[in-house]
Amino acid sequence: MSEIHSKPIAQRIDWLFNLARRHGETFRSPEAWLARERYLAEHPTAIAVLKCMDGRINIPVATNTPTGILMPFRNLGGIFDLGWPHLGEVLAHHVLRMTSAGRRVLFLITYHWSKGNPQRGCAGFQYDTAAAIAHTREIRQQIEQIFGSGHGTVYPLVCGFETDEDALSIHGTDGTVLDLAKLSASEASTLEPRLTTLLPDMPTQMRADLLPLLHGNLEHIAQVREQTSRHERLLDVEHREWVICIGRGFDFLHTPNLALIIGPYSPDLADPLQKAASIIESNMAAGRIPDDGFLLLASVPYDEIGVDRARAEMKANFLSRFSANV
């Protein structure tokens, strides 16, 4: 995978569409479908992740979570405002659809940073981690304003993501932070009581459904450290994206550091598109990817054939034209 970044653009595009085809075949397979159904039966909490468009922020990979379990929402810097008309509608629809099926909803509201070099942090906040954390708390308050602060059904959880080691940090209700990078594999058994102390107002079932992500992250951190010790991760912590994705439905990009994914939520879509283009340009200038082109990919998911699919095609064509003209 790491070699694909240096290939000519035509080969990279062919590789990407082959990746999408393989992902689709695997995702639709009986075994994968049954595995997802079993996982959701054991862990019924619906988990959504609000995160930055940065291609290094790949929570399913960092938590060893099967594809199709976590619902992603992406934007520049992880900057969201639930007052945005489209974002508010999408989130409300998601929550109502989950709760009507008897499921609680956990929102992971993420920010990211780098312990090795602040310049590898979040450009959307000018590498100011404190500002990013403050914004996640604002999002948490907005979610509580819309869905209630009792947290019996919808729980907004602030999470940090350290990109050098792909390590999660969980922010508790009293300001305490559980930094998984500071735990060893032998301390995995302590995660459950730590989480109970950290998040006493979180429903028991929801904590039980969050635990597999934390266990998976501990395992992933250990793998990352092994890669680092073998000098296999020197470039992976830096931007190497060569794809700009606009829209939703990019679950097949289950690969870190490949694409900058922009959700269609902000009333000002031009701003994140311009920022994404500047990151791609910087990647080319620094020699991290070839300068022979990049891919702009628009996608809109649909649930039903007929009108829903026709609208999705029209919206995808619009997003493609709009993005190309920015």
Identify the residue ranges that each predicted region occupies.
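Divalent-metal-activated hydrolytic enzyme cores
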Residues: M1-T45, G77-V90, V95-V105, W113-L295, ...
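Active-site-adjacent alpha/beta core region of enzyme catalytic domains
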Residues: A48
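Catalytic core of membrane glycerolipid acyltransferases/transacylases, capturing the structured
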Residues: K51-I79
